[in-house]
Curated annotation (Swiss-Prot):
The keyword Magnesium does not apply. Belongs to the IL-4/IL-13 family. The lineage of its organism: Eukaryota, Metazoa, Chordata, Craniata, Vertebrata. Disulfide bonds join C48-C76, C64-C90. Interacts with IL13RA2. Residues 1-18 form the signal peptide. This is Interleukin-13. The gene is IL13. Keywords: Cytokine, Disulfide bond, Glycoprotein, Secreted, Signal.
């Protein structure tokens, strides 16, 4: 009985070593890039019915600004996973209608073009090793 109890305790302790750990930023960025590639390659109809989003400044705070722009697009299942992934990169909670100083508020572009621009920028960041 004592041996069985010892084994249960040992397995419980070892179970902590096998538990999932946070995804490294490089892996998360690579997964986001792959998702954006899938979106841009699998377009048969206009992405999100041609919805328009605010253009963003890609030089700083790109993840939160991109999420702020895309969060206002509703009813578009093609970008839902991208929204969730961007949410993981953004340190603060983003809600619909939120405005950022990083957004270029006078320019709206189609979601498809926004995704392509974001993809090119994220590929550049990945090549340069800028994962955060």
């Amino acid at each position: 009985m004592a041996l069985l109890l010892t084994m249960v305790i040992a397995l419980t302790c070892l179970g902590g070593f096998a538990s999932p750990s946070p995804v490294p930023p490089s892996t998360a960025l690579k997964e986001l890039i792959e998702e954006l590639v899938n979106i841009t390659q699998n377009q048969k109809a206009p992405l999100c019915n041609g919805s328009m989003v605010w253009s963003i400044n890609l030089t700083a705070g790109v993840y939160c600004a991109a999420l702020e722009s895309l969060i206002n697009v509703s009813g578009c299942s093609a970008i839902e996973k991208t929204q969730r992934m961007l949410n993981g990169f953004c340190p603060h909670k983003v809600s619909a209608g939120q405005f950022s100083s990083l957004r270029v508020r006078d320019t709206k572009i189609e979601v498809a073009q926004f995704v392509k621009d974001l993809l090119l920028h994220l590929k550049k960041l990945f090549r340069e090793g800028q994962f955060n």
